[in-house]
Amino acid sequence: MKRCQSSRPTAAVAAVVAAVSMIIVLVSGTAIPSAAAAAAVEHTFVVSQVNMTHLCKEMAFTVVNGQLPGPTIEVTEGDSVTVHVVNKSPYNLTIHWHGVYQLLNCWNDGVPMITQRPIQPNHNFTYRFNVAGQEGTLWWHAHDAFLRGTVHGALIIRPRHGAASYPFPRPHREVPIIIGEWWEKDLPQVDRNMTNGYFDDYSSGSTINGKLGDLFNCSGVLEDGYVLDVEPGKTYLLRIINAALFSEYFLKIAGHRFTVVASDANYLTPYSTDVVVIAPGETLDAIVVADAPPSGRYYIAAQPIQAPPPDTQTPEYATRGTLQYSSNSRNSSAAAMPEMPHQHDTMRSFYFRGNLTAGARLHRHGRRRVPARADESLFVTLGLGSVCRHGGASCKRGGNLKESIVVANVNNVSFHIPAAAATPILEAHYYHRLHAGAGEEEEELAERPPRAYNYTDQALTPFGPEEMRLEATSRAVVTRRFRHGATVDVVFQSTAMLQGDSNPMHLHGHDVFLLAQGIGIYDAARDEGKFNLVNPPRKNTVLVPNLGWAAVRFVADNPGAWLMHCHFEFHLSMGMAAVFIVEDGPTVDTSLPPPPEDF
């Protein structure tokens, strides 16, 4: 059958990138040094709309430099990075550097109305940050209006002393694998719909490195799929990123196994498995040895995961690429398909994560061990509720969309992003202003929800009388302040209100230690004894299991205003977020500097 080829950057877009890059280099007066000797890495991101045709439909998509996924940023630990963003799209946006510590550099975290005002159409903005003390796979993405569905790319940090210093055999080649979704919709409109309580929008497919694969077709013409060429006996490091807006995925390669060696740019004790599980926002580094018969072709399959009925079922689409041996690249025989876990096998995800522990090189770059105890603790429920439309104080709740809006919440408060006319939260904090802006209501994230209930009772629903028995959700700019250097425990508790959703919770500006996870309701007297205080994995994104909990510990040692949120994009739009404000320490070296001069 014929195949539908993926789109390529247009000549016009390439010309714009080249021209803008040349202008920036001339203005700055700095040449870009060679990769071998470079301490400074410089990129230009031109954000624009390009037409792409898939599934028999041509649409304009917002991308960077005319490509999907966007450019890969490759750096060495200790390098400085400069990225000039030229916004030629019709949308406001920012770029977030997912997982980068941004130590004493919160101004460059890239979150609209938290750390900066968004970059408006036909405006430019320059991000500057260092990648000190980190090695591994991170990524970058837009942080506004669902645009990260097409505005994203890999950020790879290699060891300062080269690939020979990896704590695993040096790979023959390193390969980014980005799992995403294909949307036949205007993504900012999807964001507006969900912010207003309407949930009828779903993706049309899943992708591997921007390609839908041969499970999809247009009038019988198969979609182009990603192809990984390998050499027999060689070792490959797959840098896997879940850039999807909605779904956790199983990833499996027929006839091959993975050795998972890192997650979220933190080394792990090597873990051998035939399937990896990855949630939105997470990264995994996995070694694959090309040791299958080279005469064969092997599918690389990615399958979304969702909780089984009676939880809400949504359209989910698997995708697949192909692993083939270079000595047999002309082989057109049928590829072998791996036997995939069932899409409802959420416990497979739970046990996969339970097998991950920190590697022996955790403490490289002076990273601290997990503190033995916490200075303060939060118990944070993740749920749904409703607020009255049009700012009303009283309305019929329980799914009456004419009077109320279904929102997501943390401890029964739904996060409201400050309006564009307000002052960004970081700026308000730095200049000691009490509020994020005129007319913006702030509320402190409480240590616990306002009322305890049976959080995992599956009779609970946000669309009926049970929801109406709970307190009405409030909507505010939700913040929580921490003393510099405080050790903080957070237990995230999933609730049945979420209708089967797990929750990948991401904290900006910090890694957290994943101490434990469980199914059911967290009980401190019973569950604190399960905390791993020896070798817990370090993460920037932690999946809270469906009808379960996850306990994390972090040290609030990076001053600034850091967003904490669910990385399911619709949960963020609906309000499952808060801002963790870390106060300055006692010295200049522990205090946030003023904003950059050109900020």
From Swiss-Prot:
Cu cation 4 binds at residues 503, 566, 571, 576. Its main location: secreted. Its cofactor is Cu cation. GO terms for cellular component: apoplast. Its EC number is 1.10.3.2. SUPFAM superfamilies: Cupredoxins. PROSITE patterns: MULTICOPPER_OXIDASE1, MULTICOPPER_OXIDASE2. It is an enzyme of class 1 (oxidoreductase). Glycans are attached at residues 51, 92, 124, 193, 217, 331, 355, 412, 454. Cu cation 1 binds at residues 96, 506. Lignin degradation and detoxification of lignin-derived products. This is Laccase-15. It comes from Oryza sativa subsp. japonica (Rice). The gene is LAC15.
